[in-house]
Curated annotation (Swiss-Prot):
The keyword Cytoplasm does not apply. The keyword Protease does not apply. Its EC number is 2.4.-.-. One of its GO terms (molecular function) is glycosyltransferase activity. Belongs to the glycosyltransferase group 1 family. Glycosyltransferase 4 subfamily. This is Putative glycosyltransferase ORF313. Keywords: Glycosyltransferase, Transferase. It comes from Acidianus filamentous virus 1 (isolate United States/Yellowstone). It holds the Pfam family Glycos_transf_1.
Length: 313
């Protein structure tokens, strides 16, 4: 049995590839030898820390009859699907834990990490933010996300809202959607630079579990426009950024999958986007600094202690 902790990803075409690299960095910073290997392709005799789609990974684990020490999941769930895996499950929010925990030995809630090395290359402190943020803004709104099955990440919705308001030229998006500027293949540093260049990050997901975390944008002082429900309400509590009230929760069947989704007021979303677009420089900088401080304190108080607890387990 090797002492090397191998980190696996289930998808190189989306955020899991980036997240796998981040786990490797955080483990090494805390004195644990770790290596990002790639996609899960065959059993090995080493320890495994799997970052993967909850269902695809479950099928693969059962097919190969293997046990992993840590299993990372943040996707949809088949409510009728019956399985049990003798592993620790790590999910990014209680929103996920409510759906998945009964299938695993133990469940931890741990939001995805911010790449602090990349953040420090862009903005080190509040004073730097005050001096540089406004003059570095190149566009008003940014959204990033790989859409699948339906507009789960809110990429199409963001575009439609901007179209209705006549400001679609102010939205920059990185996604697999054909109207977007680029497929999401940003490097870590490149991704944070894009966050910093945006005045606001638009995150209108119907069922967000923080697969691509809005904390990344917040870490460089970019406020988030978001629906105040599911994981957003859990972590932000409407205290930061520009929240949109949610109207209710439902189950959406797309093909053979059931998605837990929330609905929010589209008219209110338009009003908030208009308000953000017309915000004064003084008000914006105040919000940017509050966003930056919120993200920094949240990670210091919640993420790092929980990460250490999980590693000790």
């Amino acid at each position: 049995m090797t002492s090397m902790l191998e980190i696996y990803s289930g998808c190189r075409a989306c955020s899991y590839d980036y997240l796998s690299v981040l786990y490797e960095q955080y483990f090494r910073k805390n004195g644990i030898e770790a290596k990002y290997v790639g996609t899960l392709v065959r059993p090995t005799d080493s320890q495994k820390f799997l970052i993967d789609d909850i269902l695809h990974g479950s099928h693969e684990l059962m097919r190969q009859r293997k046990k992993v020490d840590f299993f990372r999941g943040d996707s949809v769930l088949y409510p009728w699907y019956d399985f049990h895996i003798d592993s620790i499950l790590i999910v990014p929010s209680n929103w996920n834990a409510e759906q998945y925990s009964k299938y695993f030995r133990k469940t931890y809630v741990l939001p995805h990490f911010v790449n602090d090395d990349a953040v420090e290359m862009i903005v080190r402190n509040e004073e730097r933010l005050k001096e540089d943020k406004l003059r570095n803004i190149q566009y008003s709104f940014l959204t990033i996300g790989h859409n699948n099955d339906f507009d789960r990440k809110g990429i199409v919705l963001a575009k439609r809202l901007m179209d209705r308001l006549g400001i679609s030229n102010k939205l920059v998006c990185y996604s697999n959607e054909p109207f977007c500027h680029k497929e999401h293949r940003l490097t870590e540093v490149g991704k944070y630079r894009e966050y910093y260049r945006a005045k606001f990050y638009v995150s209108l997901s119907y069922s967000e579990s923080f697969g691509m975390t809005p904390f990344e944008a917040m870490a460089v002082g970019t406020p988030v426009i978001y629906p105040n429900c599911h994981a957003y309400a859990e972590y932000f509590k409407g205290e930061v950024g520009l929240p949109i009230n949610c109207q209710g929760h439902s189950i959406m069947r797309i093909g053979d999958k059931d998605y837990n989704v929330w609905y929010f007021d589209i008219d209110e979303a338009k009003e908030i986007i208009q308000y953000a677009d017309s915000m004064s420089d003084e008000e914006y900088i105040d919000m940017s600094i509050k966003t930056f401080e919120f993200a920094k304190q949240f990670y210091a108080r919640n993420i790092i202690p929980k990460l250490i607890e999980i590693m000790k387990s």
